[in-house]
Amino acid sequence: MALTNADRAEIIAKFARAENDTGSPEVQVALLTAQINDLQGHFKAHKHDHHSRRGLIRMVNQRRKLLDYLNGKDHERYTALIGALGLRR
């Protein structure tokens, strides 16, 4: 099931660097991670949904690009974000 507006607002409030911050890499990565985790359950029930799997791979690649950018820009923020989201890298 897709993220609700309340879920999005909660994630944005948790990872925002300033009020009304929706564009920082931390917020974008957190939202992508929530969407990716949501799709994991979908694929357990629908193994042959290749069209949606392509969208999942695109989201994972976008998250990786944002994480690489953040790692090069500010390594401390990167490690804090990885720890907060429970991602391995």
Swiss-Prot record:
GO terms, molecular function: rRNA binding; structural constituent of ribosome
Record Pfam families: Ribosomal_S15 (PF00312)
SUPFAM superfamilies: S15/NS1 RNA-binding domain
GO biological process: translation
Highest rank taxon of the organism: Bacteria
This protein's UniProt keywords: Ribonucleoprotein, Ribosomal protein, RNA-binding, rRNA-binding
SMART domains for the chain: Ribosomal_S15
Keyword rRNA-binding tagged: yes
GO cellular component terms, semicolon-separated: cytosolic small ribosomal subunit
Signal peptide positions (record): none
PANTHER family: RIBOSOMAL PROTEIN S15, BACTERIAL AND ORGANELLAR, SMALL RIBOSOMAL SUBUNIT PROTEIN US15M
Family note: Belongs to the universal ribosomal protein uS15 family.
Known partners and oligomeric status: Part of the 30S ribosomal subunit. Forms a bridge to the 50S subunit in the 70S ribosome, contacting the 23S rRNA.
Function: One of the primary rRNA binding proteins, it binds directly to 16S rRNA where it helps nucleate assembly of the platform of the 30S subunit by binding and bridging several RNA helices of the 16S rRNA.
Protein name: Small ribosomal subunit protein uS15
Native organism: Acinetobacter baumannii (strain AB0057)
